[in-house]
Amino acid sequence: MLRDLFAPAGLVPLLLSSPAAATLLYASSYSGAVTTLNLTLSGTNATQSTLQSLSSSNGCAPSPSWLQLDKANARLFCTDEGLTTNVGTVSSFKTGADGVLEQLAKTETISSPVSAVVFGGKGQGLAIAQYGGSSVSWFDISNPAALTPVKSETFNMSAPGPNPSRQDAPHPHEVFLDPKGQFVLVPDLGADLVRVFAVDGANNLVAVDSLVAAPGSGPRHVEFLVTPEGKTYLYLISELANTVTTYDVAYRENKTLGFTEVFSGSTYGAGASAPAGASAAEIWISSDGKFLTVSSRNDSAFSISNPDTPGEGAQIPSDSLNTFTIDAKTGGLTLLQKFPAGGRIPRQFSVSKAGDLVAVGLQSDSRVVVISRDAASGKLGEILTSAKVDGEVTAVIFDE
């Protein structure tokens, strides 16, 4: 998502060398738990940092899949994919400085919710993408102790897509709010679409024209960039094709969005193909608009020291985080750096508000790692610390 401006680059070393700078993170996993982690940065360049579990909640069980923080209202939303049931759920929690999550509400959804986003002028709506249920639902969340269904839209396809095993039906994979708060975008992996909904009032959505993606590409997640010159770009990461595609976005008078493709390239850089079996996952753009980072799963591009047992010499395979520089004039991307994600299957990652820390959720290793990042250069530095989390990690976010 678009974030506040970075702190000046000169402030970053001060943060990393502070005696005990503490930050809270939340991690969800298929164990059924949402775990609060305490990150303490200490030592020169944070080389003696620690990441420890503070508390845990099973209120989003059995299969937590996504975390959405509403920091302004001290609320955390969690979707439960319902892997062992026929329905999904969404839960809300009150957050606190001690890291303890107090459950406020929980309600059923259509099956397999995998993403949620708060929308509406006062944050009174919550949209949810339901991958297995081929649908999008939205809720009235104006009452913190209630999650009231407003409406659902279920999608259909007349025939499977070019990749029948993955595109047997529509599979909405994310809900994402545009920079103006006027639209919710829904990448649909199964239908090769980015569905678009206009925000209508405090907690309602209205379907408008969709973006048609390349056949068989499998849209997964999106990010927006607004340039200093006022251009708006949409960046789409596609799981099946392992590509990032840039669209010039136009806000039309009829309250729809127009999309013009201006760039498309591999998640591994110009002229590079994804390794067999690799699949693109997360995408993020720095708030200064200069850098874009993606995670790639199942490429085993690196062999690294086990972050859980530093100094013992054990080596483990690691998938990739690939960073690109952004050409704000054209929307194009140029590969800047390939970096180990800290283990296997980096399903999701988050970046701190200051842009100096990256938290990665490694699904297959049941691990969260924290990596240093130079906000000025855009490059990742080193794995600072890690923590084991019960179950397959599905999301990790900073409490900020």
Cite the ranges covered by each PLM segment:
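Fungal secretory targeting signals
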Residues: 1-23
